[in-house]
């Protein structure tokens, strides 16, 4: 918003350096806020709190003190660029921008940043799938409204030529650039192994599979790039109004990617699918990982995944194919569904190093926390399983069967 208040915090750097708590205190002192409680939902390393102004206005306060070595997307530069992306969309795509929660304050400190938005009483996009056996239809009603807004009011307002090597640089390269962070944190025998077995399936290390896939990437490149409508459309970045009479169109967006460059809408579609298949269940349920000499790695969730998620995953691609808002968009982009599956698998792999910068507790349904390294390991192993299956199917049939591919993370996981 052009009328947002941008201030510099004047608090002195603490002797031991900035912590989340010290930065929050600086924000509340600067803005005169009273903190009610921490909001633990969300997947980024930023800490989020509900707070109140002296005038009684409810706000959400997001504070980021980046961890050393944080990957792109979890660093301070990305945090600050998110605000610039929202600002751009208010001019470029005002109908979509109306769905973004407005930024009320921006506070920059010495090596940290914070922002505030109005507090929005809400649930995440996937909440209907957890709450009711009938929630699958409600989810798709809501998701159809979201896709319509993102595509028709957002992505479609611009069209740009796709540069050569786009998929290799943006989709595959995102994981490869983060791989050194993962190698420094996970067991050396795993990260140096060229071959491993995951859930009974012999696999190659992901970077080797991606080398073999390099020659196929141009075949699934986007026909065009479009406006930077979001770029991180996971289910927790879409807030559904908690009002009982809320319509499907009553949602708010938060936390875009932090880029004003042209973008591929398939990236966001794949991010939502990834949220349902691996990311959100992992954060809510935790991973169970076992290893033996005979069977290799066995990875699944600690408890069975939500039935609504499984149903939505298997309906996801058929639903997208039937969406009117997408039919025209991808009419001359025959590789979009195969690109979506590739991007989904790379989201799983690229998320592994992200989880290492977790700052908030991640309790499962029984209250047991998941350590950052546990979440990183689970994502890496399931991503390894998926990318190997994708490469096998492409080599055997020239295309990927979505049902059998996604069944690897919905129907065939060992129980915790």
Residue ranges and their predicted role:
Residues 304-416:
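ATP/Mg2+ or Mg2+-diphosphate-binding catalytic cores
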Residues 88-94, 123-190, 206-222:
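Conserved kinase catalytic-core helix
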Residues 44-53, 211-265:
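Active-site acidic catalytic loop and adjacent metal/ATP-binding pocket
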Residues 26-56:
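ATP-binding glycine-rich phosphate-binding loop
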């Amino acid at each position: 918003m052009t009328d947002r208040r941008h201030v510099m915090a004047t608090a002195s750097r603490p002797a031991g350096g900035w912590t989340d708590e010290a930065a929050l205190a600086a924000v509340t002192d600067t803005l005169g806020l009273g903190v009610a409680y921490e909001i633990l939902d969300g997947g980024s390393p930023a800490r989020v709190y509900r707070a109140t102004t002296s005038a009684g206005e409810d706000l959400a306060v997001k504070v980021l003190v980046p961890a050393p070595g944080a990957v792109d997307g979890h660093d301070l530069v990305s945090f600050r660029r998110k605000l610039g992306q929202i600002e751009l969309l208010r001019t470029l795509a005002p109908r979509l921008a109306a769905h973004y929660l407005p930024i009320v304050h921006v506070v920059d400190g010495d090596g940290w940043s914070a922002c505030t938005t109005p507090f929005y009483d809400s649930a995440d996009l996937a909440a209907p799938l957890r709450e009711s056996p009938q929630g699958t239809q409600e989810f798709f009603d809501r998701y159809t409204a979201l896709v319509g807004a993102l595509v028709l009011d957002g992505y479609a307002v611009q069209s740009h030529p796709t540069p050569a090597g786009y998929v290799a640089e943006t989709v595959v390269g995102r994981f490869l650039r983060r791989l050194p962070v993962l190698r420094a944190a996970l067991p050396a025998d795993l990260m140096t192994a060229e071959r491993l077995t995951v859930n009974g399936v012999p696999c190659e290390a992901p970077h080797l599979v991606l080398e073999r896939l390099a020659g196929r990437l141009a075949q699934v490149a986007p026909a065009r790039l479009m406006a930077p409508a979001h770029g991180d459309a996971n289910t927790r970045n879409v807030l559904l109004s908690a009002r009982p009479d809320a319509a499907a169109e009553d949602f708010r967006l938060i936390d875009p990617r932090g880029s004003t460059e042209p973008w591929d809408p398939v990236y966001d579609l794949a991010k939502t699918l990834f949220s349902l298949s691996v990311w959100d269940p992992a954060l809510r349920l935790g991973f169970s990982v076992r290893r033996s000499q005979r069977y290799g790695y066995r990875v699944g969730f600690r408890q069975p995944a939500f039935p609504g998620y499984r149903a939505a995953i298997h309906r996801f691609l058929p639903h997208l194919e039937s969406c009117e808002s997408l039919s025209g968009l991808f009419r001359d982009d025959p590789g979009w569904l195969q690109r979506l599956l590739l991007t989904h698998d790379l989201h799983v792999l690229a998320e592994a190093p992200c989880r290492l910068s977790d700052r908030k507790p991640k309790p499962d349904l029984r209250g047991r926390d998941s350590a950052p390294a546990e979440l990183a390991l689970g994502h890496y192993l399931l991503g390894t399983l998926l990318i190997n299956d994708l490469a096998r199917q492409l080599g055997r049939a020239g295309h990927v069967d979505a049902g059998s591919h996604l069944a690897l993370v919905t129907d065939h996981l060992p129980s915790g």
